[in-house]
Curated annotation (Swiss-Prot):
Binding, substrate: G78, I152, M173, E174
Residues at the active site: E12, D197
Catalysis performed (reactions): S-adenosyl-L-homocysteine + H2O = S-(5-deoxy-D-ribos-5-yl)-L-homocysteine + adenine; S-methyl-5'-thioadenosine + H2O = 5-(methylsulfanyl)-D-ribose + adenine; 5'-deoxyadenosine + H2O = 5-deoxy-D-ribose + adenine
Coiled coil: none
UniProt superkingdom: Bacteria
Gene it is expressed from: mtnN
Protein name in the entry: 5'-methylthioadenosine/S-adenosylhomocysteine nucleosidase
Role this protein plays: Catalyzes the irreversible cleavage of the glycosidic bond in both 5'-methylthioadenosine (MTA) and S-adenosylhomocysteine (SAH/AdoHcy) to adenine and the corresponding thioribose, 5'-methylthioribose and S-ribosylhomocysteine, respectively. Also cleaves 5'-deoxyadenosine, a toxic by-product of radical S-adenosylmethionine (SAM) enzymes, into 5-deoxyribose and adenine.
Species this protein is from: Haemophilus influenzae (strain PittGG)
GO CC annotations on file: cytosol
Keyword terms: Amino-acid biosynthesis, Hydrolase, Methionine biosynthesis
Classification via Gene3D superfamilies: Nucleoside phosphorylase domain
């Protein structure tokens, strides 16, 4: 099995990249794909760049060139569900766009034509992620992750997203685009993100301060998954 891993930022993939043996590097547009072995397992690690388009370009290149059997999206997210704190893990059961709106033509909020309203994560991967997170002693929640091309940093924006998606756990900028590409290519995926901020007025300062912690937490979980896949 070859495991595909996607992170948007250098900080989000650095730990995993540095553990990779026999590493090769391929650049496609703004994306970088690192291939090699982590703990003896074949891994293709994508640093996609930030945002939905960058994530889609990179994930398409990853699936076409490296041909992984599954994809794990790692990195950070803003926590909007009650009780989430910095460093906690959110695992996707499903992902949706919070900034897509074709409701004028009868689609659900967040749904794009010719696509489902929600992209469902692979249950086996999500179950494995939850099991390992709990064994590692990490605080974990599982559910809906919403994506959009905005860094959410105000209570008003959170309130608006929660009005459309009451069950949303976390918000970020790539996961649903990654999920859409995996759906199109019929490749199982899961999103595993660590909370870096609360999506509120202090989010930008919190993100800068706690991104290293979030990257460490999510990478630790992904390493545990690699050992079991």
């Amino acid at each position: 099995m070859k495991i595909g891993i996607v992170g948007a930022m250098a900080q989000e993939v650095e730990i995993l990249k540095n553990l990779m043996a026999d590493r090769t590097e391929t650049r496609v547009a703004s994306a970088v794909i690192f291939e090699g072995k982590i703990n003896g397992k074949d891994v293709a690690l994508l640093q996609s760049g930030i945002g939905k388009v960058a994530a889609a370009i990179g994930t398409t290149a990853l699936l076409q060139l490296a041909k992984p059997d599954c994809v794990i999206n790692t990195g950070s997210a803003g926590g909007v569900a009650k009780g989430l704190k910095v460093g906690d893990i959110v695992i996707s059961d499903e992902t949706r766009y919070h900034d897509a709106d074709v409701t004028a033509f009868g689609y659900e909020k967040g749904q794009l034509p010719a696509n489902p309203a929600a992209f469902l994560s692979d249950k086996k991967l999500a179950d494995l992620a939850q099991e390992i997170a709990e064994k590692q002693g990490q605080s974990v929640k599982r559910g809906l992750i919403c994506s959009g091309d905005s860094f959410i940093n105000s209570e008003d924006k959170i309130t608006q997203i929660q009005a459309d998606f009451p069950n949303v756990m976390g918000v970020e900028m790539e996961a649903t685009a990654i999920a859409q590409v995996c759906y199109a290519f019929n490749v199982p995926f899961v999103v595993v993100r660590a909370i870096s901020d609360g999506g509120d007025g202090k989010a930008s300062m919190s993100f800068e301060e706690f991104l290293p912690l979030a990257a460490k937490q999510s990478s630790t979980l992904v390493l545990g998954m690699i050992d079991r896949l």
